[in-house]
Amino acid sequence: MLKLQKKLKNDYGLVFNDEYLLKTAFTHSSFTNEERLPKIANNERLEFLGDVALSLVISDYLYRTYPEKLEGELSKMRSSIVRTESLANFSRSCGFGEFLRLGHGEEKMGGRDRETTLENLFEAFLGALFIDQGMDEVRKFIQHVVIPHVKNDDYVKVIDYKTELQEVLQIGGETTISYKILKEEGPAHDRSFVAAVFNNGKELGRGLGKSKKVAEQKAAENAIKGQNHVS
């Protein structure tokens, strides 16, 4: 962790008060499983917290920066910024994958550069930073790493199929859209999910993805295309 701490200080001016918290953020579930450590020692709880912190900071930034955009447009932008591929790229740009503690099996399967793993790592780091130093530091970090891409309009044109589907269906009147994970397959380090999207109880489409978020987006995309099958 010393190399990571040095990198954080040099690149972002960050010095963690709680080194164990930082280590936990960079500990994958495959590592705790192989080492027979308590499940609470992996980064999943921190990921949960970081996801909320990230969404709040991005929402606040978009609201203040784009006063002319309506709620639907802001939601599309936020969704494109916090989607799996985007967060994985932010994690790569920070060089976080190098410091992730993985199980040997996960390492051999290419887990160090897996999109969902890097997404979760980025969110876990934000969660750890929030606990260690508060929301202001989380905001500063996001301003440094994420916001420059937003300013370049990198995410304005990215399609959020869930939002698009909702807008299409609302044209026809009253609608209640819901998503359900129908199936989970594969080992813990390489899961696949099948999601279905429903409108007023009627299934419209299914999608396959390496995360629940991706599977739901794919289901929405297939629903828009009128393809009621998994792809």
Swiss-Prot record:
It catalyses: Endonucleolytic cleavage to 5'-phosphomonoester. Disulfide bonds: none annotated. The active site is at 51, 123. One of its GO terms (cellular component) is cytoplasm. Pfam families: dsrm, Ribonucleas_3_3. Keywords: Cytoplasm, Endonuclease, Hydrolase, Magnesium, Metal-binding, mRNA processing, Nuclease, RNA-binding, rRNA processing, rRNA-binding, tRNA processing. It is found in: Cytoplasm. Mg(2+) binds at residues 47, 120, 123. Residues 160-229 form the DRBM domain. One of its GO terms (biological process) is mRNA processing. The keyword Repressor does not apply. The keyword Glycoprotein does not apply. SMART domains: DSRM (SM00358), RIBOc (SM00535). It comes from the Bacteria. GO terms for molecular function: double-stranded RNA binding; metal ion binding; ribonuclease III activity; rRNA binding. Belongs to the ribonuclease III family. NCBIfam families: RNaseIII (TIGR02191). Digests double-stranded RNA. Involved in the processing of primary rRNA transcript to yield the immediate precursors to the large and small rRNAs (23S and 16S). Processes some mRNAs, and tRNAs when they are encoded in the rRNA operon. Processes pre-crRNA and tracrRNA of type II CRISPR loci if present in the organism. This is Ribonuclease 3. The lineage of its organism: Bacteria, Bacillati, Bacillota, Bacilli, Lactobacillales.
